[in-house]
């Protein structure tokens, strides 16, 4: 009898709980909901609630709350949400000093117990945290990625659909660059059922949608007092599903660049083919001069925060 897949979720907070619920409903595998020892009972309680939910919704996934890395051993996918979420007035980069020790601890546990897992980092600032995770573990770049572009593109996709008054299902959007205020929505790559979005939406309105996309996470923080969790969880699950089922979806993720787009030794949002081997190909899009300029600005921001991480190691 084949072994069931195991997905380990590091952090049992808002995103961790929603991740567990989505993974269980999709029957992608059994779930380990991991948190620090002080929150062991919280993780166990959330796991029990989710398992009981399975009796209502009809899924059979095992969901275990724990603070022991031994329970994560051999995980097929590791999704890292551990860290302090943003509060109103904070940027993602403000979290680096707080979350860096946390990501290092997680990296050490993963290296020992989950050496063959695909790793998806959600903890902010994503581009810096995923860089440190890869640096500390030495995992191959094909199996270490940050969740950013899927979420940012989804936000852009929604705003485009609302502006054009069309179904969000017909909109395809792409956001590259760092997961911050300098992210790069790519108008030339946006289509509405094959029609360029630029033909249906004026440049003035498109620029306003781009600005809102860049501040999309901050808008939610201001409204809720904490970071988003439904859409981020769905974005990470889409990535995990493409890997586990070898779907080979083209998704924008924070990937380690080694010359692609002209950048080296940084993680930044780019389109990739994500399949059973992890990142199987980085897709280099033809960009307009304006888009290249915006990407360079974003890369400079990412490099700055990455240099802070390098200096502290």
UniProtKB/Swiss-Prot annotation:
Binding site for substrate: 86, 92, 124, 155
EC number: 1.1.1.37
Residues annotated as transmembrane: none
GO molecular function, one term: L-lactate dehydrogenase activity
One example of a Gene Ontology biological process annotation: lactate metabolic process
Cystine connections: none
Catalytic activity: (S)-malate + NAD(+) = oxaloacetate + NADH + H(+)
Binding site for NAD(+): 11-16, 35, 99, 122-124
UniProt key word Oxidoreductase: yes
Keywords of the record: NAD, Oxidoreductase, Tricarboxylic acid cycle
Enzyme class: oxidoreductase
Catalytic residues, chain numbering: 179 (proton acceptor)
Keyword Cell cycle: no
HAMAP family in the record: Malate_dehydrog_3
Function: Catalyzes the reversible oxidation of malate to oxaloacetate.
Family: Belongs to the LDH/MDH superfamily. MDH type 3 family.
Name of the protein in question: Malate dehydrogenase
Native species: Sorangium cellulosum (strain So ce56) (Polyangium cellulosum (strain So ce56))
């Amino acid at each position: 009898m084949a072994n069931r897949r195991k997905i380990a979720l590091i952090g049992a907070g808002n995103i961790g709980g929603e991740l567990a619920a989505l993974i269980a409903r999709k029957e992608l595998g059994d779930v380990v909901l991991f948190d620090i020892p002080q929150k062991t009972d919280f993780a166990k309680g959330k796991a029990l609630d989710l398992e009981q939910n399975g009796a209502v919704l009809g899924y059979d996934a095992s969901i275990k709350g724990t603070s022991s890395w031994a329970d994560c051993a051999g995980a097929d996918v590791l999704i890292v949400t551990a860290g302090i979420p943003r509060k109103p007035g904070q940027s993602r980069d403000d979290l680096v000093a707080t979350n860096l020790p946390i990501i290092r601890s997680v990296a050490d546990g993963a290296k020992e117990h989950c050496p063959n897992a695909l790793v998806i980092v959600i903890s902010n600032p994503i581009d810096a945290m995923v860089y440190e995770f890869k640096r500390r573990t030495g995992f191959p770049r094909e199996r270490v990625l940050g969740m950013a572009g899927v979420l940012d593109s989804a936000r852009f996709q929604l705003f485009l659909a609302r502006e054009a008054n069309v179904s969000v299902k017909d909109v395809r959007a792409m956001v590259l660059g760092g997961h911050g205020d300098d992210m790069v929505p790519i108008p030339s790559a946006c289509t509405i059922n094959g029609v360029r979005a630029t033909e249906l939406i004026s440049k003035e309105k498109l620029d306003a949608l781009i600005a809102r996309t860049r501040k999309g996470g901050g808008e939610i923080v201001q409204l809720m007092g904490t970071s988003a969790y439904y859409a981020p969880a769905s974005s990470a699950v889409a990535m995990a599903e493409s890997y586990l089922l070898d779907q080979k979806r083209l998704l924008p993720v924070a990937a380690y660049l080694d010359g692609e787009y002209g950048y080296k030794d940084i993680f930044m949002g780019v389109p990739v083919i994500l399949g059973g081997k992890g990142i199987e190909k980085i897709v280099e899009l033809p960009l307009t001069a304006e888009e290249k300029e915006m990407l360079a600005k974003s890369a400079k921001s990412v490099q700055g925060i990455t240099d802070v991480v390098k200096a502290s190691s």
